[in-house]
Amino acid sequence: MSWIVNKQSSQEELAGRFRKLMSAPDILQIPGAHDGMAALLAKEAGFSAIYLSGAAYTASRGLPDLGIITSAEIAERAKDLVRAADLPLLVDIDTGFGGVLNAARTAREMLEARVAAVQMEDQQLPKKCGHLNGKQLVPIKEMAQKIKAIKQAAPSLIVVARTDARAQEGLDAAIKRSEAYIEAGADAIFPEALQAENEFRQFAERIPVPLLANMTEFGKTPYYRADEFEDMGFHMVIYPVTSLRAAAKACERMFGLMKEHGSQKEGLHDMQTRKELYDTISYYDYEALDKTIAKTVLPDE
């Protein structure tokens, strides 16, 4: 049913669902959804939560992931995803978009968008993708202050603290930072760019809160299955840019086909049909809002 007329979950309800999911015995798979259509397809596939990646969002706007977007911009996209799917959403808020006050403002914006959880990292600006070299980190105290500010500004918002320290300072330092972030109020920890099974297991042995793994493509982490992350002691796994990469490659192939053949006909088998599209976006639910609108009759495919 259309979100315009259907009762949707409150932020508190969505956060409560996310908290239960991340604490459940089975690992929580969280696919990235870079737009509303991807969010709907993730829900259709049976996922219980979705993720908004800063990298995927910026790329969807033709921009690099270098900290050049604003909190208001990503909050607007987050609102689209929650409206579309009514699923708990974990949002990548980079470094909090500035200092402590910026992090607090971001938290309030996420609350207004009905976001269930946020992920914040301990990099300095300009930040980089977590699987690239040359990252610089803020002091532990600064990251802890941001976490405290978020929890004060938006108590119901779940905070997943990401540390990029493994690459710059080593595994023990990453664990030490994580312990400080938990003390500051973080609800879960995201150790970025771990590179081997023993590293994941060490984190799980020493960190008492739910842990999130990043199964991005073309990164430093080997391609583990969800059940393998679960066996290593992790509670969540994200696939941050998968939807955008798949969509972009499909567009690239289709545009090449159109340019080569002067038509898209040869690629129709790779497209959503009109019926599939209408079913996904609940077209007829919207049309039913006005009984005077004639029901659309689909042409033969």
UniProtKB/Swiss-Prot annotation:
Q: Could you tell me the keywords of this UniProt record? A: Lyase, Magnesium, Metal-binding
Cofactor names: Mg(2+)
The EC number of this protein is 4.1.3.-
Listed under catalytic activity are:
3-hydroxybutane-1,2,3-tricarboxylate = pyruvate + succinate
Top EC class per UniProt? Answer: lyase
Give the superkingdom in one word: Bacteria
Family, similarity comment: Belongs to the isocitrate lyase/PEP mutase superfamily. Methylisocitrate lyase family.
Q: What is this protein called?
A: 2-methylisocitrate lyase
- Gene designation: mmgF
